């Protein structure tokens, strides 16, 4: 499994690492990959795409790296299972609802309720680990 993420402050990266911990605890292999380092062809061979991005600005996906990545894969992911996660500093999670809606629009199957965490995942560490375990057992 591969977890692809973008993180501005490190919070979403921490979430990715905790989700990976849950996957590993379930007996599966996983790699966490910053979106700037992802090999899209390899990623598309995965059964489940695990994608994470923090909210930016007016609750949107990060525009210089993550948004172009999503645009690039958008025509290649119909029928794929996806799991979404990310952190935010303010707002109510609109960016994640929009992200989930887009993935559904591309023909993806969102396999778990997207996981969002306000600020650092300290208090939500176990939630992140459990999210990883759920994904590993799909």
Curated annotation (Swiss-Prot):
SUPFAM superfamilies: Flavoproteins (SSF52218)
Pfam families: Flavodoxin_1
Record flagged with keyword Endoplasmic reticulum: no
Domain Flavodoxin-like: 1-136
InterPro entries according to UniProt: Flav_short, Flavodoxin/NO_synth, Flavodoxin_CS, Flavoprotein-like_sf
Recorded superkingdom: Bacteria
Gene Ontology molecular function, alphabetical: electron transfer activity; FMN binding; oxidoreductase activity, acting on NAD(P)H
Keyword terms: Electron transport, Flavoprotein, FMN, Transport
Listed cofactors: FMN
Entry-linked PROSITE patterns: FLAVODOXIN, FLAVODOXIN_LIKE
Role of this protein: Low-potential electron donor to a number of redox enzymes.
Similarity section: Belongs to the flavodoxin family.
Protein name: Flavodoxin
The species this protein was found in: Clostridium beijerinckii (Clostridium MP)
Organism classification: Bacteria, Bacillati, Bacillota, Clostridia, Eubacteriales
């Amino acid at each position: 499994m591969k977890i692809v993420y973008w993180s501005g402050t490190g919070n979403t990266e921490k979430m990715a690492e905790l989700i990976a911990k849950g996957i590993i605890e379930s007996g599966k292999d996983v790699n966490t990959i910053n979106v700037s380092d992802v090999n899209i062809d390899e990623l598309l061979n995965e059964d489940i795409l695990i994608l994470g991005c923090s909210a930016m600005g007016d609750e949107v996906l990060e525009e210089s790296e993550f948004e172009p990545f999503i645009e690039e894969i958008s025509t290649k992911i119909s029928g794929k299972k996806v799991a979404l996660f990310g952190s935010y500093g303010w707002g109510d999670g609109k960016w994640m609802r929009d992200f989930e809606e887009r993935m559904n629009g591309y023909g993806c199957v969102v396999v778990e309720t997207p996981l969002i965490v306000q600020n650092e995942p300290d208090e939500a560490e176990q939630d992140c680990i459990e999210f990883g375990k759920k994904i590993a057992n799909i």
